[in-house]
Structures are given as C-alpha cells and as structure tokens.
Amino acid sequence: SYVLNNPLNLTDPSGYSFLSKYWRTIAAIVVTVYTGGLAAGAATSWAAAGWSIGGGFVAGAIQTNSLRGGVYGAFSAGVFSGIGTAFGNMAQTGAYSANALRIGKVVAHGMAGGVMNSLQGGKFGHGFASAGVTQTFSPGIDRIDAGNMGFSAQRTLAAATLGGTVSAMTGGKFANGAVT
C-alpha cells in the first residue's frame, strides 16, 4: 500500500526531478549554513572573516561548478562580513544613532548586493533589492530562534529564503539572492 501496489507509481521516467535542477543551490546553502556556524564561534573578526570567505568560496564553487564561482562567493562573503563588522564596530562607539546605523547598514548591504550581482552578469537593481530587503527584515529574522545567541540554521535559512524570493520577484535568480 506504500505506492498503492504499483512500484512505478512514484518514479520519474524522464529522469528529471527538482533535485537535478536545484542540487547545486541546495548544496551551496547547506555549506553556507555550516561554515557560517563555524564563523560564529570565531574569537576574532579576522578569524570570522576567514571562515566566511572560505565558506563563500566553497558555496560559490559548488553552485557554479567553477573556480570563478568560488572566487565570487569568497569575495561576496568577505564584503558582507566586512559590512557587518564595520557597522558592529560603529554601534559600539555610540557616535551614531540606532536609526542612522540601521539605514546605513541597509544601504551598504544593498550596494554590495547590487555590485556583486552586476559582477556576476546580473542587474544591479536585482542584487540591491535582494540584499537591501533582506537586511531590512533582519531584525525580524533575528527573532527566529532568539534563545540561541550564536549561529542559527533557522535564521540563515530564513534570510536565504527571503533574499532568494526577493531576487526572483524582481526578475533575478533565486539562487543568487539566496546565497548573497
């Protein structure tokens, strides 16, 4: 009764399934989730940046099956890690209001996302919207698994889903938005 007594009922005779089309994107997101977790426990910002860049390289290489994709992934991870570190340091100084930092961080993420998307042959606006909107909703995403002060796979997957969805809605690729 598992397959209603027809073992061929749940097969795909064409050999094509959603996994054959999306396995690289899924693998890249999984690598990003796990290497992000390693970066969360890093003692210094340089170590965290190193883990982020390494994870970005592996995720980009898996997604594109190329060294070029790995380099883009590493560069993208380094840029976004640097933005997060810079705004974290500015917040600690107390020289800027919380609203100014929030707006600045959204714009910085949007600009970085736009540039990264342009470098990969996409449109600046798609990358800007994807990264900017994801950063805009980051306070809500941060409330997911709020008891976990370190790395959270749930938060990472929520951000990847939001970024990919915004990218797809603006005419870009889901995978580009999910990874950045």
Predicted features and spans:
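Acidic glycine-/aspartate-rich tracts in secreted/extracellular proteins
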Residues: P7-L8
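Extended, hydrophobic alpha-helical membrane-active domains that insert into or remodel lipid bilayers
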Residues: T11-T180
